[in-house]
Amino acid sequence: MALREIGDGWIHIKDNAPIRRVVFAKAMWAAGGGAQVFLLILIGMEAGFGSVAAGSIGILYMARGFGSGTGPVIGRRLMRSDRLKPSLLGWSIFFAGVFYLAISAVDWSWVILLLVFISHGSSGINWVMSTTLLQERTDDEWRGRVAGTDYLLLTSMMGFSALGAGLILEGGHLTLRETIALTAIIQIGMGAIWLIFATPKERLMIN
């Protein structure tokens, strides 16, 4: 019975394009962002923000947390704009990647705290806006199953992303900086995919 209801939820998502588009938004961020969760730890171990690595890691995660919380507050007007709303999910993924690409290129000094803050502020907009849109577009009967699918896709993609980056580093295929750049490029690509394919359809819904 439970499995059938889950299956019915997936069919409902498949048959409803406005829901289907948005349910992948967090997973698109996580294609690169999943790896960045643990790459941030490795950055903290190399960056010199304190006498011990744990302090540097904590400071980086504090910047990440403040960014995730502040981004949606600052971006609230953007999320309400009919002109910007159709493309905002794509841009939020895109710019999250851009700032991690910058992190891969600059010296790991205090400046990366600002870059981490801005990147995760952008991804925070993605998380809040995608959740809000799913709530708005889904009837009560399906809301739990849609939300469950949303987080299933997110956590699965985070796992695949982290595993892939871990294997790349362990195998010595890329350096830490190069791996960070790769995850950033993946996010930029995912954001571009949303902007090219999803934004026009989102605009049609508003118009």
Predicted stretch roles:
Residues 1-24:
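Juxtamembrane intracellular "pre-TM" segments in multi-pass secondary transporters
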Residues 42:
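Contiguous, function-dense segments enriched for cysteine-driven chemistry
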Residues 11-15, 33, 45-46:
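Residues at helix-coil transition
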Residues 7, 45-207:
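C-terminal transmembrane bundle of multi-pass solute transporters/carriers
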